[in-house]
Amino acid sequence: MSTYLSNKLRAISFLSIVLVVILHSQLLVYSKGNSFHLQQFLTSEVTRISVPFFFYISGFLLFYNCKTLNYSWYCSKLKKRVRSLLVPFLIWSISGFTIVYSIKFILPSAFNSYQGLEKYQLVDFLQALLWNPVGCYQLWFVRDLFLCVSISPILYGGLKILKELFLLLLFLLWFFDIQYVISIESVLFVTIGAYMALNHKTLAEKVNSEGSVLLQGILWIVFCVWDYSCPFYNIIHGMGLLLGMSFVWGLYDVVYVRTLGRFSNCKVYRYTFFIFVFHEPILTLVKGILLKLAMSQTGILLIYFSAPILVVGICLICARRLKKYFPLVYRIICGGRSQ
């Protein structure tokens, strides 16, 4: 893989995690009027490209050097993902549950979305730790990604035997929101990434022109606005996501050329995974504190935009300190990601 493409994937991954934090900072239940509509537009449309991007990049990297899928390749990839995905999932899931449970024990009114924790039975505890994490709900992505790696031979076989038809079938399931165990969005975009890695590596290296990127950006905004009144929401929303991803992918090329690569390898990109796993429940706590100061819809909107900046800043400070003074701990909780 070229240095250009490697840096591009890291930069887009960092942008995606920033969008995830903005997505999770929404305060729609407290909002109305212009504040509500702006948050709805950003939360339900613009920031939604972040999760598919993560899955796409993960699928691309998983299959990038795969010439043929055999038992040795599968065991090697699964072993690496146990360290990089499963171990961090368990650590952060247990930590998130412990934090929320402890805070609710001291302040029962905190974390209103997690009622009845004190009544949990063994099955509830296991589900909260292994399937639907409490406090760190964003870990569902890590869970689904590990499951996608586990079924990678099926995805590989589908692409090799059915080729583009396999992608079409997954697209249809996604457009019509047909779900089963693993999110269909997870499976689809991991598979798209795998398809590109197996068949179109050179296309991923292609530098997009400013004209095509501008057109994609305009169309993306049109589709985002169109979503609100369209009776075929899933289809239009899905097409908007694809346009948005294509736009951001090409936008990197434009920014790289315009800035002479100034932002191609920023040091903050190395903390993407830590921000992802650490931003909750920190973000919920920050929003709860700031909401007590909000006196108007303008105040709520300011919280919506300022909370992500504050939380990302906290995450970066904590990541740097942890990596500096406890490098082994940092590597373990981040799945070996130290660079």
Identify the residue ranges that each predicted region occupies.
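Solvent-exposed interhelical
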Residues: 147-171, 178, 195-214
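Aromatic-anchored segments of alpha-helical transmembrane domains
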Residues: 18-25, 167-181, 216-229, 281
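Small-residue-rich segments of transmembrane alpha-helices in multi-pass membrane proteins
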Residues: 88, 92, 216-220, 273-278, ...
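Hydrophobic transmembrane alpha-helices
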Residues: 60-64, 148, 152-156, 186-202, ...
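Membrane-cytosol interface segments of multi-pass membrane proteins
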Residues: 1-170, 296-339
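Membrane-interface junctions at the ends of membrane-embedded or membrane-associated helices
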Residues: 2-3, 65-76, 157-162, 198-211, ...
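Interfacial loop-to-helix transition and helix-capping segments at the boundaries
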Residues: 39-51, 130-144, 174-192, 207, ...
